Amino acid sequence: MKDPFTPNELKVAVIGGGTGSFTILSALKEHTSQIAAIVNMADDGGSTGVLRDELGTLPPGDVRQCMVALSDSKRLRDLFNYRFEEGSCSGHALGNILLSALEKSTGSFAEAVETASDILRINGTVIPATLDNVRLKMEWPAASYILNGERVIDANYFKHDPRKAGLSLLPKPTVNPMAVQAIEQADVVLIAPGDLYTSLGPLLVIDGIGDALRRTDAMVVYVCNLVTKDGQTNEFTVTDHAAEIERFGGGSFIDYVIYNNQQPDIQLAARYKKEKAFIVKADKEKLSKAHYESVGGSFLGHIVEHEVGDNIPATRSLIRHNADAITDTVIELYDTWIKREPSR
């Protein structure tokens, strides 16, 4: 088994899906090359969903985004992100097709990821959380209500409180041992922003991930989402988000929560209001009593518009975190942490 890190640099394991991890990884690679991106493998929407259904391959989309974020070559990044605009490949990113082709030709998704990483010359390691072909299930036992599939769950307007639902992957997966090793060996574990129920939850519920998070000596940081999601996390506060993260992982493991306290400009606020999405509120009284420390700041980043050629239905985030500000904050926290916890 390949070692996710080499010595003598800050070692960071980033846990997440595609968009949230991409944002963080793009800035983090400027500070260290010892990065392990642990990636959700339950995606079945958009281009990824079509390739899974038609080719029987594992989901490439989130893995591609993480690899692209860690590449220093703009030409290769653009190539892997290129989306076809016409023909039978319309809506597909070239990187998704390449990863699926490599998996089919080698018979191994792990080998496909390693080969594509070599092509992109990435700084770091991209680690699928599991190498099993799984689908996401969300179940409210008390209501006898079940939703199946990441795409279905992502688009659903929940009839019941999601905090009373259980998340699971079917069939029950085996954790990728490299993911556990990365969490255990890291100096910092960074849980990236992302959809609670279709991006972060499906990764954290894999047996072995939560145990590793509780066992690690690393500083564990959760970067809270910027906005709520209509029909799913309406009125969720910062502590609500953090509580769900730890529920998925089976117990307490967060040391710091980073959250945004900057308000968007009027135009951006109006665009979000149309989608009934609002800046996540910091419930400061609850935060002051939490077992973790919290750090608020101005973390709003740039607006991202719909990609050209991206015509396969999928949800794309409108705004990103200011990744440079997030990364600087994490490094400052670690400098304080290591002085306070010298044995770690």
Please report, for each region that a protein language model flagged, where it lies by residue:
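Gly/lys/ser-thr-rich phosphate-binding loops in alpha/beta enzymes
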Residues: 1-61
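Non-transmembrane, aqueous-exposed alpha-helical and coiled segments at domain scale
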Residues: 2-11, 29, 33, 121, ...
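Short glycine/serine/threonine-rich phosphate/pyrophosphate-binding segments
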Residues: 19-25, 193, 198-205
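A short helix->loop->beta-strand "cap" motif at the edges of active sites that frequently abuts
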Residues: 32-33, 216-220, 254, 292
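Electropositive, gly/pro-rich neighborhoods at or near active sites that engage anionic ligands
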Residues: 42-161, 313, 317-321, 325-336, ...
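Active-site gating loop/helix substructures
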Residues: 136-193, 197
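Charged helix-capping and loop-helix junction motifs
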Residues: 203-210, 236-241
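C-terminal functional extensions of proteins
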Residues: 235-344
